[in-house]
C-alpha cells in the first residue's frame, strides 16, 4: 500500500523497522480485541447500571417528548416525565416489563398463587399468629369493645372480662387455622399475583439487577471475555487492507473509511455473538444451525433455576410480602370481608343461645360493627410475620424448594424464553453501542497508526 504506517505522533515503520503490513498485522488485532472487550464490558454494565435514572434536565425537552415515536420514548435515555436526558440500566428501566415476563414465563408456568400458598405450613402460620396474639388478647378485646360499646364494657365486672379473655384466647388457634384454610382456598381471588409482582419489582428494581447478576454471573463474565474475539477479526481486516487497493471499484474507497466501517462492524459482531451464545437456542440444536448447539445459560438450567427460585422465595414471594398484599393490596377489601365473616361466624357460634340477649344489650348496629372492629384488630397482627425473621425464613425455604423443583421441570426453551424476552427489545441498543465504541476505537487507531 502506498500509505505509510505513520500516525500523528509516531512513524511506526521507522520506529520498528517493519513494513506497514507487519505493523497492521499486529496493531489491528490488538485494537480489535480492546474494542471487543471494551464494548462487551460496558454493554454488560449498561444492562444493570445505574439502577435509578441519572441525567440532566434539558429545557424544552418535555415539549418535544410527547411527539417522539413510542419506540424512542421508551428508551432508557429519557426520564419517565420526558424532562431529563441521561441513562438508566436496561433491566431496571424495563422493571415493569421484566416483572410481567417473569410472571407469565415463569411463575404462572410453575404454579398458581394457590399452589404457592399451600406450600407454606398454613397451620404453622396460623399457630404462629395465634401464639403472637395471645399476649395481646386482652388488648385486642378491650380495643374492640371500648370502640363499639364503651359504657357496656366498663360496666362488665373484672371477673367476667377475664372469662371473655380466656374464652377468646382458647379459641384463637382454631379460629386462626380456619381463617388460613379459608384464605388458602380463596387465594386466587384475593391476590392478583401479576399485579403484585409487577408493583413490587417496579418499586424495588435492585432485585431485578440482583436476579440477573446472580443467575447469569458466569455468562456475564463470558460476554466480557468473548470480546477478545475481536482479535481475529482485526487480523482479517489487516489482511484485507493489504489487497484493498487492487480490488476493482471497491479499491477506490479510501482505506480510512474501510477501517472505520470495519471497526464499527467488529463492535456489533462481538456483541451479537455474545448475546446469541448466552441466550440462544434454549433447546439443543444441530451444530450446522448453532456451532455452540445450546445457550450457555440453558446448559446451567438446574443451577440457574435454583438461584432464581431462591431470589423469588426470599425476596419477592416472602410471607411478610404476601401478608401485606393480602391485607393492603388491590383485593385487600375482599380479604378483610372474609376475615369479618369468619369472626362473625365465630362470635355467633360462641354466644350460642345468648346471642340475641347480647345483641340486644349491645344494640343491633354496634353488635354487627363488632365483627368489623375485630377484623381490624386481627389485621393488626400481620406485622408479626415480618418481625419473626426465623419463622419467615422457614416458610421461605418451603417456597424455595417448591419453585426450584418446578423451574427445573421446565424445558430449556421455556426456561430461556423468560430471560431472552427481557433483553430482546433492547438488544439493538447494545449493538448500536458496540458500533459507536468500535467506531471510536477505529478512529483512535487511525490517529495513532495513520491511514
Where are each of the predicted segments found?
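Transmembrane helix-loop junctions at the membrane interface of multipass transporters and ion channels
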Residues: 4, 8-17, 237-252, 449-451
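Large intracellular
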Residues: 4-216, 253, 257-422
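Helix-loop junctions at the membrane-solvent interface of multi-pass transporters
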Residues: 46-47, 241-244, 277-278, 448
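Short, charged low-complexity intrinsically disordered segments located at boundaries
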Residues: 131-139, 227-229, 242-245, 337-344, ...
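Bilayer-spanning, highly hydrophobic alpha-helical transmembrane segments
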Residues: 197, 219-240, 423-448
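Core alpha-helical transmembrane segments of integral membrane proteins
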Residues: 228, 232-248, 252-272
